[in-house]
A protein has these predicted regions:
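N-terminal subdomain of nucleotide-sugar transferases
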Residues: 1-49
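Conserved donor-binding/catalytic core segment of Leloir-type glycosyltransferases
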Residues: 4, 196-199, 203, 208-222
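A short, charged, and often flexible helix/loop element on the N-terminal side
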Residues: 44, 49-84, 128-129
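A short beta-strand/loop micro-motif in the catalytic core of glycosyltransferases
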Residues: 90-91, 147-156
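Short His-centered aromatic/hydrophobic patch
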Residues: 92-97, 116
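Nucleotide-sugar donor phosphate/pyrophosphate-binding loop at the beta->alpha transition
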Residues: 111-113, 121-143, 160
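Carbohydrate-associated surface elements
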Residues: 157, 180
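Acidic anion/phosphate-binding donor-loop and adjacent secondary structure
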Residues: 163, 181-203
Length: 222
């Protein structure tokens, strides 16, 4: 099975949670499927971070260099959609990539799944900042959610937000899949040097190593 992931962020260009999410998702899917990644940010140089097998990076189209940023995004989306032929499923992340996933699904008659990391209707302040660009991003996101075969929400709260923002979406198509943690990256340090570094780090942060520690990984919001 071939799965094409479509994303704005991918190494070395990660600046938020969505990029971390896609990077880790690609890692765990590769042993299970033929995974292709279509990412913004231009081609990755061989041997550098993000230049994994099956990764294609796309630069903004030079013809749209002076256009609104949302139109530049759509230009990349169109190019990505045209390169998803042969995929069995496309999976997009954030509004930047949602239109590419939506169009690729229509063009190739394959399911388009999207993961909700944020929602444009819940960011009305962007209208003042981006003007017409916000209208375009909202339109693209709405089209993608309306046509998606499935929508993944990272929590029950996000699922409620999706259904409130896009009431036209069938609730049966919105599934909750909580974010996970790769526990291999969370283990007791081994060796004298690692133990010394761990002790120094705890001391620097004011953490008492004799007391139990709970680690929270997530977003703190009101």
């Amino acid at each position: 099975m071939r799965v094409d992931l479509i994303t704005k962020e991918y190494p070395p260009f990660i600046y938020g949670g969505a990029g971390v999410h896609v990077n880790e998702l690609a890692k765990v899917l590769r042993p299970l499927a033929d995974v292709r990644v279509h990412a913004f940010g231009g081609p990755r140089e061989p041997g550098t971070e993000g230049a994994d097998p099956g990764v294609t990076g796309y630069a903004n189209l030079p013809e749209l260099a002076e256009a609104n940023a949302a139109l530049q995004t759509f230009g990349v989306d169109l190019e990505i959609a045209g390169n998803c032929a042969g995929a069995d499923l496309v999976h997009s992340h954030t509004w930047y990539a949602n239109l590419a996933g939506h169009l690729a699904g229509l063009l190739n008659d394959i399911p388009h799944v999207l993961s909700a990391h944020s929602l444009e209707p819940m960011r009305p302040w962007k209208a003042e900042q981006l003007g017409g660009g916000y209208a375009l991003s909202s339109w693209a996101e709405g089209q993608a959610y309306s046509g998606a075969a499935a929508v993944i929400a990272v929590s029950g709260g996000m699922r409620e937000d999706i259904l409130r923002s896009y009431p036209q979406v069938d609730p049966e198509r919105v599934k909750v899949v909580h974010n996970g943690i790769d526990l291999s990256g969370w283990r007791r340090p081994e060796g004298e040097a690692a133990a010394e570094l761990s002790e120094a780090t705890l001391k620097r942060l004011g953490i008492d190593p004799t007391r139990p520690t709970v680690v929270f990984v997530g977003r703190i919001t009101r």
